[in-house]
């Protein structure tokens, strides 16, 4: 496993891009209307393609896909081929990954002009990425990315407010985060980059009595975000935008 830390250059890039964002999408509502499956956000003559995978949304969550608005606007402005894979987040990530792999292979076949693919899964979308890469053939043109994604779950140390829902999901999905130990120790055939937050600054995990990021995946690259960049807290949602900036630049 290789560890990297971000430099102040990323902070400067972030400051500039916040000021000059292209507003193709003004609201999460536009993304919410997109059907499940693989959808085109933007196409261009670029040789790079970004494939986005969203995470889990609780029943009470209003701003579904809000975290993707700013990254998508940035990618569109910079003429990057961008695709969005949507799915039913109540399904098991392992099952979702099976469909995703079919869709990804079809997408690659349809866009032979793209010679570098970046698959980016945020939060539970990163779990889908892990199951995807687990069952993927080697392809040197694909880099898999997990952003703000837990690598293991100690259910007994999760706050009671969320413990029951996690227990139900794990009972429903025997192939879950805690199924990867053997795979993590061996590593994956394809390149994997983990974009990790500091647990105490991640709204999703800060109340956990353990660090869900604290797990080694052999031969993966780890990018550890600081607690803030240019005064902007790097949290569970904002880390997605920072990761996209670094991937593109």
Positions of predicted regions on the chain:
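Active-site catalytic motif of lipid deacylating hydrolases and related acyltransferases
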Residues: 21-115
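Hydrophobic/aromatic beta-strand patches that form the interior of the parallel beta-sheet core
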Residues: 51, 83, 145, 193-196
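C-terminal catalytic-base region of ester-bond hydrolases, centering on the histidine
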Residues: 167-171, 175-249
């Amino acid at each position: 496993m290789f560890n990297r830390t971000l430099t102040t250059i990323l902070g400067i890039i972030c400051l500039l891009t916040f000021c000059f964002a292209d507003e193709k999408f003004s609201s999460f509502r536009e993304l919410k209307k997109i059907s499940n499956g693989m959808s085109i956000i933007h196409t261009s003559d670029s040789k790079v393609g970004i494939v986005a995978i969203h995470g889990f949304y609780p029943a009470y969550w209003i701003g579904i896909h809000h975290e993707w608005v700013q990254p998508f606007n940035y990618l569109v402005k910079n003429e990057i081929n961008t695709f969005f894979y949507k799915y039913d987040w109540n399904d098991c990530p392992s099952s979702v990954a099976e469909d995703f792999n079919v869709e990804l292979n079809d997408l690659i076949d349809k866009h032979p002009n793209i010679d570098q693919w970046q698959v980016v899964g945020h939060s539970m979308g990163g779990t889908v990425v892990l199951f995807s890469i687990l069952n993927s053939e080697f392809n040197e043109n694909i880099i898999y990315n997990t952003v703000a994604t837990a690598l293991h779950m100690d259910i007994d140390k999760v706050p009671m407010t969320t413990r029951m829902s996690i227990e139900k999901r794990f009972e429903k999905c025997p192939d879950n985060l805690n199924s990867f130990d053997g795979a993590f120790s061996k590593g994956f055939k394809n390149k994997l980059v983990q974009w990790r937050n500091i647990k105490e600054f991640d709204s999703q995990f800060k109340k956990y009595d353990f660090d869900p990021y604290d797990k080694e995946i052999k031969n993966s690259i780890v990018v550890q975000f600081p607690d803030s960049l240019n005064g902007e807290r790097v949290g569970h949602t904002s880390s997605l935008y920072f990761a996209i900036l670094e991937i593109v630049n």
